UniProtKB/Swiss-Prot annotation:
PANTHER family tied to this protein: UBIQUITIN-CONJUGATING ENZYME E2
Protein family: Belongs to the ubiquitin-conjugating enzyme family.
GO BP annotation list: free ubiquitin chain polymerization; postreplication repair; protein K63-linked ubiquitination; protein polyubiquitination; protein targeting to vacuolar membrane
Keywords of the record: Ligase, Phosphoprotein, Ubl conjugation pathway
Assembly with partners or alone: Heterodimer with UBC13.
Modification Phosphoserine, positions: S71
SMART domains: UBCc
Record protein name field: Ubiquitin-conjugating enzyme variant MMS2
GO molecular function: ligase activity
Species, as recorded: Saccharomyces cerevisiae (strain ATCC 204508 / S288c)
Length: 137
């Protein structure tokens, strides 16, 4: 089976993100519509219910480097969040986060955003004290 070229893959993800075909709990799209390399993306995650994240909207930046989707994107929270997989100073999602560490070409930005949302809802993380809403890194 041949590999889909990077730009075709990103165009598929862009279309899905823009048309809202994904789950309502996360969204993503190009940070700059003129970015012909489709490198810089924005993402949002709606905090999971029954957690300290409930009713919060988290903003993230996603950097799909030249080797994406063979290599994972770099993901950084813009909204302050307290999670073990997020650098508390920079907001960057650590490379040892299971989805990044075990990255597969079939994974998408949506996969990553949904897995981060699931991480927020785990018993160990859903009660973690969070910064005031609206704070940024």
């Amino acid at each position: 089976m041949s590999k889909v070229p990077r730009n075709f893959r990103l165009l598929e993800e862009l279309e899905k993100g823009e048309k809202g075909f994904g789950p309502e709990s996360c969204s993503y799209g190009l940070a700059d519509s003129d970015d012909i390399t489709m490198t810089k993306w924005n993402g949002t995650i709606l905090g999971p219910p029954h957690s300290n994240h409930e009713n919060r909207i988290y903003s993230l930046s996603i950097d799909c480097g030249p080797n994406y989707p063979d290599s994972p994107p770099k993901v950084t929270f813009i909204s302050k969040i307290n999670l073990p997989c997020v650098n508390p100073t920079t907001g960057e999602v650590q490379t040892d986060f299971h989805t990044l560490r075990d990255w597969k070409r079939a994974y998408t930005m949506e996969t990553l955003l949904l897995d981060l949302r699931k991480e927020m809802a785990t018993p160990a993380n859903k009660k973690l004290r969070q910064p005031k809403e609206g704070e940024t890194f």
